[in-house]
Swiss-Prot record:
Stored InterPro entries: Ureohydrolase, Ureohydrolase_dom_sf
Signal peptide: none
GO annotation terms (biological process): putrescine biosynthetic process from arginine, via agmatine
Protein name: Uncharacterized protein TM_1158.1
GO MF entries: agmatinase activity; metal ion binding
Organism: Thermotoga maritima (strain ATCC 43589 / DSM 3109 / JCM 10099 / NBRC 100826 / MSB8)
Amino acid sequence: MIPPHIHILDFNGIYEEQRILKSLAEFVFSKKIEGIRYMVLPEKIPEIENILPSHLGVTFLGDGEFHHLTYFIIKKIKRPFVLVVFDNHLDAREEEFLTCDSWIRKALKLKHLVKVVVVGTQEQEKIHRVFYSETDPQKILKLLGRHPVYLSIDKDVLDIGITGWESGRVSLEDLLNVLRHIPLRKILGADICGEPDPLEFWKMQESEKVNLSILSALFFEKLHYVPGSEHLEGKPAHVT
């Protein structure tokens, strides 16, 4: 079986040294766009929607300040689904604009979103159709019910300290265990953010290893897919 569609949105050069990851991608957008970090200015919305891939897959968003771009991806889903978010923070503030702190609140207004399951957060607030869970695969599967799932992973949920934010409490092993338990047939797509600060270049290699581990647990192991030598050598993907 073929691997999933892998897309990289590299707005600040954060994936420049992640050569193996880039070699697995079918599409890499590498260009700085003003007015989208932390929040999306209304006039930037058409530009963002234009660069997003037309089909779902696995999208790498950069650092956590771009997590709100998940909203534009899941807005394309036209069937009932559950959103599962792995995040050290609850990005559900009441704000006028779409920001990295408010995107879940905005997403709850989407027609086809049934519920949100937030895993690993240290912030909990009673919000209609938002559920909380630790890394318990059976509880998470029960919350999914019969619906397909879209997964959004901010690596600041992990306890290994590779992001530009404070570390969470979830071990990489526990995160991967949850991902392995979600049947491939239920996964609509996923995105991953939480890259290191660009100045902390010594964290880049470890961050790439985590990205590859997540891809493996989500898809490669289930598909019995082994990347070829061209990927292991880090040959470049198509870059825009």
